[in-house]
Amino acid sequence: MSKSTAEIRQAFLDFFHSKGHQVVASSSLVPNNDPTLLFTNAGMNQFKDVFLGLDKRNYSRATTSQRCVRAGGKHNDLENVGYTARHHTFFEMLGNFSFGDYFKHDAIQFAWELLTGENWFALPKERLWVTVYETDDEAYEIWEKEVGIPRERIIRIGDNKGAPYASDNFWQMGDTGPCGPCTEIFYDHGDHIWGGPPGSPEEDGDRYIEIWNIVFMQFNRQADGAMEPLPKPSVDTGMGLERIAAVLQHVNSNYDIDLFRTLIEAVAKVTGATDLGNKSLRVIADHIRSCAFLVADGVLPSNENRGYVLRRIIRRAVRHGNMLGAKETFFYKLVGPLIEVMGSAGEELKRQQAQVEQVLKTEEEQFARTLERGLALLDEELAKLQGDTLDGETAFRLYDTYGFPVDLTADVCRERNIKVDEAGFEAAMEEQRRRAREASGFGADYNAMIRVDSASEFKGYDHLELNGKVTALFVDGKAVEAINAGQEAVVVLDQTPFYAESGGQVGDKGELKGAGFTFSVDDTQKYGQAIGHLGKLSAGALKVGDAVQADVDEARRARIRLNHSATHLMHAALRQVLGTHVAQKGSLVSDKVLRFDFSHNEAMKPSEIREVEDLVNAQIRRNLPIETNIMDLDAAKAKGAMALFGEKYDERVRVLSMGDFSTELCGGTHASRTGDIGLFRIISESGTAAGIRRIEAVTGEGAMATVHAQSDRLNDIAHLLKGDSQNLGDKVRAVLERTRQLEKELQQLKDQAAAQESANLSSKAVDLNGVKLLVSELAGIEPKMLRTMVDDLKNQLGSTVIVLATVVEGKVSLIAGVSKDVTDRVKAGELIGMVAQQVGGKGGGRPDMAQAGGTDAAALPAALASVQGWVSAKLQ
């Protein structure tokens, strides 16, 4: 009996654990140590700094099953996913790693034992082929003499990519740094499948499939190309879980393994599809894996960077669901089946299931509103296309108006053998960006052009007043030697107490003073390593080299400090109340308010807002010490310090702790103790985007001001109701009850008036061939009363055709009623349409009742006068 995918994963980890390897959990799909990577795409990513010698672990052997995504950037498999046997946006990479421990001999022997051992994978040895780098005689001899593979199944691969060491069998991290030869293991599916061994002209066939790549990091490549042996060679291996599962389960396509069969059946169930061989099922089964795990790792759909890649994958899946005939939102329903089939690897996803489902559902609902119209436009454009290429302008219009990522458009076109002019699409995108820049209305931002060679030393943690020297001056972005009174400028000092805007905290304000001059600072910004003071010289003259006294606005800084410290407390409180999925997505810390954007799928309940508020105020009352420590980044993370997603940190970081409640990396300015904050109040909670909520709050004096304002409003209301704040609830309830009674009485009077009006109108009906026709314009009648009157009149008149109209604030309201015995000759919908057209409107409804509106009240008398002739003709 073949192993399940989950059992294969566990067997791999168990095998290497038995060989002294530390089992290390999969890292996030969002790399936390490599800004050059969009997503984690290999098992070695989380160990990159270990291989580079920048990080040390307490183990020298490791094994992982690493979640990986390849979609976007250099590794973009998206367009092939679902159409080939082995392309995926998401896959798991099984790996074993040696950090200066074992090398080629053990790495090869471990691989062979796992693959062929009777207690492990038990693959037939004669089905396995290997490749080695052309000059790697050591690996060749291990395979031939120690493992015993015949020479004809060991293939040397040279530099087949056009340059020295550019080979399928030579791995390098970059132009310089660790590199080395690799050996790859292939499985022969048999001669019933087309394809040749690696290195042959038929190597792209599906017969011989690479299942394991073992990299031997033994050199350090120098800038001049020289290869220096590493003092401690290492090993990095990777085996695709889905590929080895296909081999062990005796299938040729990854989509036929148990994991994908289960997901494909789930997709068919939620979309209503019956043909399990449909490639759209494969696309969706793949895409739910990448989308669900990306959301679980903190990525949300957006129009930029990782969020845009996620959006593209979701929308591609939704479009394929549409092709399968899905009539309602379906994609989020696959998260549950995915969790089940992933086994132990899905535990983190299970913890965040509700959040992930909500994000996927919201994104699908948004796209569903425009998908049908966008596809109709694309069909229309393709139908009239003369050549075989869709122009970039149309592809851009689909993106801009209907939210179609260009690869989704390309997907549709591909099915019809049509290409997309992607260069034209990019040109249209750039033109839109240019127009947006020109239309921003802010003119040129000269300060953004400032380049400062010197550095400024920030001393504002300990000082609010400091003497410094002017090292540079800028006016309209250009360096100058001096400025005069009235000029706006940017002043750079050698040292300053002014905090430059960063980490969400606004820049300081204050004054720079000296011999005969005063410079008012309205903002402080960073320019590389320099700190610029933006403002206006109000008196005197200032030149480079002048000595200045820098004075920060102390009261303003104090308010900012309170708000910043409260932001940290609120972040920790949100994670306690809502869950650990809460992550900071943006913030503003000013002297007046703090604003905090965070990941959460639904509006906070009033009880949750109160709980967060109470929790923060409880920490304020504890008067916790607020302490800062400078330490290594890894030590800070080990201490549990929260790092902001996407933020780049130096090797040495500033860790801010508030007792046992909050620990974060932060370079901002803060209170000394939580008690300094005084009071914390949330003033609003709202949504800014799918899955992103925003809280605005105030502290200290600002919070007290909101308390006073609320108290004043309550007193004003109490005064109006002739009560006091103590019995205000009873007073309001009494007023509401009295209002309901009066509204009920008023409606009764209106009904009576309408009934009386109906009785008066019935006598005005005229007889047309045995059918009573009543046409009337009514004054002082609410439009919603017309329907009641028509029902009353139909009961009174028997066989009848009725048209009533009223004009309120210049707008015409019309209604037509026809008794059921007359609807075979006169249709209310047709009648009301004829009248509405004459008063500048339109309408419709059932044969016995129809309503309409119009804008031309002056034309109403003539329109009503035309009814009798129209009805008479119908009754002939």
UniProtKB/Swiss-Prot annotation:
Annotated residues for binding of Zn(2+): 564, 568, 666, 670
Catalytic activity entry: tRNA(Ala) + L-alanine + ATP = L-alanyl-tRNA(Ala) + AMP + diphosphate
Record text on cofactor binding: Binds 1 zinc ion per subunit.
InterPro entries (UniProt xref): aa-tRNA-synth_II/BPL/LPL, Ala-tRNA-lgiase_IIc, Ala-tRNA-ligase_IIc_anticod-bd, Ala-tRNA-synth_IIc_core, Ala-tRNA-synth_IIc_N, Ala-tRNA_ligase, Ala_tRNA_ligase_euk/bac, DHHA1_dom
Coiled coil (UniProt feature): none
GO biological process entries: alanyl-tRNA aminoacylation; negative regulation of DNA-templated transcription
Entry keywords, A to Z: Aminoacyl-tRNA synthetase, ATP-binding, Cytoplasm, Ligase, Metal-binding, Nucleotide-binding, Protein biosynthesis, RNA-binding, tRNA-binding, Zinc
Entry annotated with the keyword Disulfide bond: no
Listed cofactors: Zn(2+)
Name of protein: Alanine--tRNA ligase
Originating organism: Salmonella paratyphi B (strain ATCC BAA-1250 / SPB7)
Higher taxonomy: Bacteria, Pseudomonadati, Pseudomonadota, Gammaproteobacteria, Enterobacterales
